[in-house]
């Protein structure tokens, strides 16, 4: 069904494009949420992906599965959004009189939030690998397809991320 909708959307059929977006929106939003940790940011990222999809649908050639290609679009949009937020945060901190300190984590939900926040603070490639493998449940091979690298590179990025998270969080098991 996707193949037919893609072909029609590539030909300019707006109804087919709308159906394609509807079929995959929840996937895009869930992926965006996993990367951002915020439903508001996920809404923004998903909207950006839908707009971008309209501009680039004609470039999809079927070399990979559509969902893998869409994953890559979402990943890139999430990265761009994260960079934008980092720039805004820098600007805010430059003008803020006293930055607020986060409250310490106390329960399991807060620990989980602390862990995912630490994951999102990792270097970009490590963050991507961890979110794809642990957040999205992809195999190292599937994560490598999305990231455009080898399976060994994904394994190494995950290993390095785990070491860094153990240090940052002060935990034996991460």
Regions found by a protein language model. Give the residues of each.
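Internal acidic/polar
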Residues: 2, 80, 88-112, 116-117, ...
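Short amphipathic alpha-helical boundary/capping segments
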Residues: 4-8, 114-123
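Short, charged helix-capping/linker segments at alpha-helix termini
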Residues: 10-19, 29-48, 59, 141, ...
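Short amphipathic alpha helix immediately N-terminal
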Residues: 21, 121-142, 146, 171
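Structural recognition of an alpha-helix C-terminal capping motif at a helix-to-coil junction
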Residues: 30, 44-51, 55, 64-76
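Hydrophobic positions on the alpha-helical face of helix-turn-helix-like DNA-binding modules
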Residues: 49, 73, 130, 143-144, ...
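Arg/Lys-rich amphipathic alpha helix in sigma70-family domain 2
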Residues: 55-62, 72-93, 108, 160
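DNA-recognition helix of helix-turn-helix
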Residues: 75, 79, 126, 135, ...
